[in-house]
Amino acid sequence: MRHRNRVKKLGKPADQRRALLRALTTELIRHGRITTTLVRAKVVRSEVDKIITLAKDGSLAARRRALGYIYDKQLVHALFEQVSSRYGNRQGGYTRILHTVPRRGDNAEMAIIELV
């Protein structure tokens, strides 16, 4: 039973799960769109929304928190520069998930997650 379990474990230990989410978040912000499994896309969506909300705040503390999460320092600086013009009047919902065909090897549900 998984009653009251809020964290999607993604079949990985906590440190590997955290590293996977950081990597997927970094690549989504860098490329604007990535293809991954549906469950991973749903988990990454909340992480990306948190990072973009931090960038909208724009304070030094928010920048340092983002630098601690995203792997690329230049990407953080670019995000903080562009976010106010791109998402200034939007209150959340910065990503879109599109369902695609299942993966050939194991028939896993695949999805494209992209920045709006």
UniProtKB/Swiss-Prot annotation:
GO terms for molecular function: structural constituent of ribosome. GO terms for cellular component: cytosolic large ribosomal subunit. Keywords: Ribonucleoprotein, Ribosomal protein. InterPro entries: Ribosomal_bL17 (IPR000456), Ribosomal_bL17_CS (IPR047859), Ribosomal_bL17_sf (IPR036373). It comes from the Bacteria. One of its GO terms (biological process) is translation. PANTHER family: LARGE RIBOSOMAL SUBUNIT PROTEIN BL17M, RIBOSOMAL PROTEIN L17. Belongs to the bacterial ribosomal protein bL17 family. Part of the 50S ribosomal subunit. Contacts protein L32. This is Large ribosomal subunit protein bL17. It comes from Nostoc sp. (strain PCC 7120 / SAG 25.82 / UTEX 2576). The gene is rplQ.
